[in-house]
Amino acid sequence: MYLRRAVSKTLALPLRAPPNPAPLGKDASLRRMSSNRFPGSSGSNMIYYLVVGVTVSAGGYYAYKTVTSDQAKHTEHKTNLKEKTKAEIHPFQGEKENVAETEKASSEAPEELIVEAEVVDAEESPSATVVVIKEASACPGHVEAAPETTAVSAETGPEVTDAAARETTEVNPETTPEVTNAALDEAVTIDNDKDTTKNETSDEYAELEEENSPAESESSAGDDLQEEASVGSEAASAQG
């Protein structure tokens, strides 16, 4: 309010001046030309200076604040862009690390499975051999029932085992002894199965022959005795 009154007074002073000013002296023009003061009293001039100074300072302060705020916004925008780029780059690096870890785990898993499978096979092979031995010991009666079939199977057995051993050695020359023993056990089981089947068939044929002709049974018994004698002589010669 004080500034408003001062401004109104300074603007109203020229209007209130008389239309016909008082006559001046001869040197009045020189005084006016030499003086640098604004028209009006000294108090009104001071108020004018204050108003102008305040307006200029306010304008300068406003300009300074706008410039500094623009700079601050610009710097914040730059920092936000940098943070966004970093946030976009770091997830890709994390994904690459996760992919590398999964690949390592997948490469290690098959090796562990292979080692476990080998251990399981090595543990199961002794039990399989024990079962085969029990089956072979459980059927001695069938072997005694038909000497002809046993002789044939005895002749063919070593050949089959030798062939199986050769095949295993040719296919896998660098395999472990456990694998070769497993192959030999399988060959022995095959031979035993063949022996049992042949023994059963020979028993059936013998029953049929006995029912049909007793004479043929006697001749076959003689032939069996001759074959047993020949087998015994061969065994004695081999031992000698």
Curated annotation (Swiss-Prot):
> Is Metal-binding included in the keywords of this UniProt record?
no
Keywords (alphabetical) are: Membrane, Mitochondrion, Mitochondrion inner membrane, Mitochondrion outer membrane, Transmembrane, Transmembrane helix
* Mode of membrane association: Single-pass type IV membrane protein
The portions of this protein that span the membrane are: 41-63
Record's compositionally biased regions (Basic and acidic residues): 191-201
* Tissue expression summary: Expressed in the brain, adrenal gland and corneal endothelium (CE). Expressed in steroid-producing cells of the ovary and testis (at protein level). Expressed in steroid-producing cells of the ovary and testis. Weakly expressed in placenta. Expressed in corneal endothelial cells.
Which segments sit on the Cytoplasmic face? Answer: 1-40
Stretches of the chain found on the membrane's Mitochondrial intermembrane side = 64-240
Q: Where in the cell is it found?
A: Mitochondrion; Mitochondrion outer membrane; Mitochondrion inner membrane
Please name the GO terms of the biological process aspect recorded for this protein, alphabetically: anterograde axonal transport; axon development; axonal transport of mitochondrion; cellular response to gonadotropin-releasing hormone; cellular response to hypoxia; cellular response to steroid hormone stimulus; cerebral cortex development; negative regulation of dendrite development
Cellular component per GO? axon cytoplasm; mitochondrial inner membrane; mitochondrial outer membrane; mitochondrion
The segment annotated Disordered runs over: 166-240
State where composition is biased (Acidic residues): 202-213
Q: Name one Pfam family in it.
A: AIF-MLS
Low complexity: compositionally biased ranges? 170-181, 228-240
Q: Which Cys residues form disulphide pairs? A: none
What function does this protein fulfil?
Plays a role in the trafficking of mitochondria along microtubules. Regulates the kinesin-mediated axonal transport of mitochondria to nerve terminals along microtubules during hypoxia. Participates in the translocation of TRAK2/GRIF1 from the cytoplasm to the mitochondrion. Also plays a role in steroidogenesis through maintenance of mitochondrial abundance and morphology. Plays an inhibitory role during neocortex development by regulating mitochondrial morphology, distribution and motility in neocortical neurons.
| Oligomeric form and interacting partners | Interacts with RHOT1/Miro-1, TRAK1/OIP106 and TRAK2/GRIF1. Interacts with RHOT2/Miro-2.
Q: What is this protein called?
A: Protein MGARP
